[in-house]
C-alpha cells in the first residue's frame, strides 16, 4: 500500500493499488495509437490474472508520495577508464542513490587495479579491490529502504589477480556483510583446475599486453 514518510496509508486494498497503476499507465498510453483504457489495464492486473508487476513498479507507478524506482534491479558501471578513485566514488554515489529509491544494485569490480599496482599519488601502490568491496558493502548497510537494507551484488572475474582476496573477504566474518558476491569463472580456469595446470591472472583482464600478471594453481583455488 502507498504511504507517505509520516506513515499515512493511502490504499486500503489490492484493488486500490491496481487502479493506481492502471490509471497511470493509461495516462501514458493515451499519448499513443491503440491505447488501452484504465479499465482494460485494470482487468489485466486484477488478482494478477495476466500481469504480475515487480515490487518496485507496484510501489512507484502513479505514486505521488514517494520517489521510488520503476525497476527492481540495476547493473551499473562507468564508461571508459573506471579504475580511478573518482570513478570508484562515482559508482558508490550512484549505488546509494538507486538504493534510496528501492533499487537493488549489481556491479563488477574487475576494472579496479590489483593490490600492489603502481599509482600516481602519494600512496605509490594500489590497495586493491578489497577495501572498495568494504566501502560498497558499508554503503548498502547505511541505506535503509523502509527498514530494509539495500540489496547489492558484487562480482569479479577469476582472471583478476585479486579474485582470491575477493573470495576471502566475504568469508571473513564481519568484513563484507552488506553484499552478495560472485566470481565469474571462464573455461580456461576450469580446464586448468581439472588438469592440474597453472592459470594466469592479469590486469587489465582483457588486455592483449597486460601491465600485471600472476600465475596461480587453479585446482588449489577451486578447492
Language-model features, listed with the residues they occupy:
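Extended catalytic cores of very large enzyme megasubunits
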Residues: 1-223
